[in-house]
Regions:
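Non-heme Fe(II) oxygenase catalytic core, chiefly the N-lobe of the double-stranded beta-helix
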Residues: 1-243, 249-288
Length: 288
């Protein structure tokens, strides 16, 4: 196995390992250590089946229940319906546009996602990349006075706030939306495995509690945009079969647009946050 860091402050490419085969404990420990260090790991040319994708995912923890609460283990992020590319004005396409803004998966839940594993199945001829931003290095780059001011601050994260402009309230049933009430997360978090501090912001963060609404929204947007600058970002051009895992606890990500008439099919699994009372754990994993 070879682990080659990118030139950014995050990300490494892992080669010489076949994720279609069961991993030894030693090999997985090396992968997990690299993941904690680099936060984003790229595994080229894996071509995993759904079962293999899920088996690797479960090495990192329990599976997260999707917002549809339909028991699905995998989320299909696609602009295909009934065998054809959907028009850009369709609800399905509009919903995907929201993913082009920086975010941490599931931060609008009480317990945000631990990890996401995204596999490329069909990719467009141009565009459609995914980009990650290192919020550990973003925190490190802040002025001391800003670090001090942010300490202890709580932000409200809201599914409605981030998804309503992109049809997110229409795509879910009323019963599903009942489970997606606004939640609070610390603006500065400490990673449980590394002890490093990082910003926890992105599109789902609506405002900072106890501060002026518009001023705090502007600050959150500035922290996100200024944090997501080189050398703290890595952008991956997908090839079919690629798999990437990232740490939602300390990394933001966004997708890039691609030609509206070209297909893009990605499959994602999500590892639930390590909270024993996490209500978003898949039922079959809840007792694990």
């Amino acid at each position: 196995m070879h682990i080659q860091p990118t030139e950014a402050t995050l990300g490494a490419q892992v080669t010489g390992v076949d994720l279609r085969q069961p991993l030894s404990d030693a090999d997985f420990a090396r992968i997990e250590d690299a993941w904690h260090r680099y936060a984003v790991l790229i595994f080229p040319n894996q071509h995993l089946s759904e079962e293999q994708h899920l088996a690797f995912t479960r090495r990192f923890g329990r599976l997260e229940l999707s917002i549809r609460r339909n028991g699905s283990n995998l989320s299909r992020l696609s602009n295909i319906k009934d065998g054809a590319v959907v028009p850009p004005t369709s609800l399905q396409a509009r919903f995907l546009v929201g993913n082009t803004y920086w975010h941490s998966d599931s931060s609008y839940k009480r317990v945000g996602a631990k990890a996401s594993l995204l596999a490329a199945h069909v990719v467009p001829s141009t565009g459609g990349e995914t980009e990650w931003a290192d919020m550990r290095a973003a925190y490190d780059a802040l002025e001391p006075d800003m670090k001090k001011w942010l300490e202890g601050k709580m932000a409200v994260h809201s599914y409605e706030y981030s998804h309503k402009p992109f049809g997110g309230m229409e795509i879910l049933a009323t019963e599903e939306l009942k489970h997606l009430v606004p939640v609070e997360h610390a603006v500065v978090k400490t990673h449980p495995a590394t002890g490093r501090k990082n910003l926890f912001v992105g599109r789902h963060a609506s405002h900072i509690l106890g501060e002026d609404l518009e001023e705090s929204r502007a600050l959150l947007a500035r922290l996100t945009e200024e944090g997501a600058q080189s050398p703290r970002t890595y952008k991956h051009a997908w090839r079919p079969g690629d798999l990437v895992i990232w740490d939602n606890r300390c990394v933001l990500h966004r997708g890039h647009r691609w030609p509206d008439d070209q297909a893009r099919v990605m499959v994602r699994s999500t590892v639930a946050g390590d909270d024993p009372d996490n209500e978003w754990v898949m039922p079959e994993d809840a007792a694990a």
